[in-house]
Amino acid sequence: MKKLFSIALLLSLGGYMASAQELYMPRNIKAAYAKGTRSMNGKPGPNYWQNHGKYNMDIKVDAETKVVSGKEEILYSNNSSDTLKNLAIRFVNNLHKPTSPRSSAVSEDFLSTGLNISSFSIDGETYKVDSKNWGTVGNVKLKKTLAPKSKITVKIEWDYPLSKESGREGQIDPNSFFVAYSYPRISVYDDYNGWDRIPHTDRAEFYNDFNDYEFTIKAPKNYVVYATGDFLNPDEVLQPEISARLKKSYNGNEVIHIATEQEMKDGKVTKQKDWNTWKFAVNHITDVTFALSNHYVWDGASVIVDKKTNRRSSAQAAYNPTTGKDFANSVKYNLNALDWFSNNWPGIPYPYVKTIAFQGFADMEYPMMVNDSQFGDPVFAQLVQDHEVAHTYFPFYMGINETRYAYMDEGWATTFEYLIGIAEHGKQAADDFYKKFRVDQYINDKSTEEDQPIISMSDQVSGAGYGNNSYGKASLSYLALKDMLGNELFKKALHTYMSNWNGKHPIPWDYFNSMNAGAGQNLNWFFQNWFFTNNYLDLAISRVTPAKGKSTVTVKNVGGFAIPFDVVVIYADGKADTIHQTPAVWKANQKEVNIMVNTIKKITSISLDNGIYVDATPKDNVWEGK
């Protein structure tokens, strides 16, 4: 029996393997599967590896000069089977250098001198590093090669100025700073591309290894520091009452004003030494970020995110009490988001100890932090914050290569944003928001760049094509698959994918193969339709063929995407029937499908309702009876 089961399992997996090979696969990806680092059954292969760094950092922020400086020690492990002759060093904030390539024009306030490295050594040996000529990625040629399964210790001393104009990071106001991508890091070396040397140009986002961090932030008195990771020394840097409130907020759902506007003004929040050193630590995470201000107020509470263990996560907010009116409800919004994402979609307990919403300008996600704008519209503010918190799962929990595959990241955050929006504001409001911000612009623009295949490398796609491939089109594919499989099976398949790859570095083919395995069926026809074509959203009723008691409605798929739709039949007596079609209707014939409708009563009209899959030419979606 066991042997027969094993043979059946092999035949089943063989079916997945054969079907997966039907999808286009670049040569370097084929090589990874051939080497056994990835597997056609959706799981990491028997030879899978990823490199790792242990970062110990001491960082200082000078609020007067706006200079960030630091010392770091990196214990870097080469877990690959390759001998490394170079280190690729990534420093995203060199984007501010005048000589760095960027995806769009910037103002003078955006520009800075970039990174200065004053000391660089490997295993105690000093290196001369010309960081002034680096872009967002620099190269260090190793004096001694780094053998497989061996380690080196890299020590760096560095500094750089915070840009006056804040985007994803920089100065929010003269005394509030969001300090992201703040340290030189060893870039990713992976099994399918080797060193990641793609420059950051301010459009396509990031790709980082899972590392361990211990770090300190030295800040002037009265500046509160908010950061990724466990806050290790609140009693050393906060006054007793403030520290007590923070700890209390960790254990209850009631929003606590940890530090008020008046307390910040009166110097009653931080210890009154000239400088305070804030300590943080976190393991197995892709990045750490921090922010600080001497006048933002501070709120906090917590919520149970894992009902099996009763583990709680903290939700905090830091904002300007005068201008940040949206943020007065930020903790309440995040308590709801952490609970909803943990128990609904994706239905995996929020994996971190906290999330902090900091008032800034970027509307951007970071591990355990978001940097959001003040909108003046509480509904919109909540949806944006929901989107950024959803990024906890994609890219951070899942280790996504956002630079190459933004749709594996933004597409899921957009999907979860929509699903939580239904719970918060009702389906009609969520549909309207989704169509307005995620679909309308794309489908009403007939230009070529809108119809590039989703599988296109994100750093190679620009303009509207980048945004729509990454957000709306990718999200529509995930929601279409959910409609086709149904909630239960879709969640099973999604959890298979997330279980296979959380904490690692999946690529699109790992997603395809994992979903095939989790759903227990060959979905490659669907993935081919959505990811590897120039399809778009456009259905049409090509004809209605009457017959006794039944009529045949022939629906033509002009645009090509396998989308769900409703056939709405209006009868002469004013009553209506709605016949839902899942994307499975397109499996046998992706060009045209026949739908049978009841014609016992006289029909006034038949129409197609595509819902959020907004039709490019809605005028041909209606048939009027004679």
Predicted regions mapped to residue ranges:
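Beta-strand-rich binding/interaction modules
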Residues: 226-227, 239, 544-609
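Early extracytoplasmic/domain-onset interaction patches
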Residues: 24-88
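Glycine/proline-rich low-complexity spacer/linker segments in large multi-domain proteins
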Residues: 99-110, 159-213, 234, 612-626
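Short, hydrophobic/aromatic-enriched beta-strand segments in well-ordered soluble domains
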Residues: 72-74, 91, 150-164, 213-221, ...
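A surface-exposed beta-strand-loop module
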Residues: 26, 67, 77, 105-175, ...
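Hydrophobic alpha-helical and helix-loop surface patches within well-folded domains
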Residues: 24-40, 52-53, 280, 315-554
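Solvent-exposed beta-hairpin/edge-strand motifs
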Residues: 84-126, 180-183, 218-223, 570, ...
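Hydrophobic helix-coil surface modules that form long, contiguous segments used
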Residues: 190, 205-386, 415
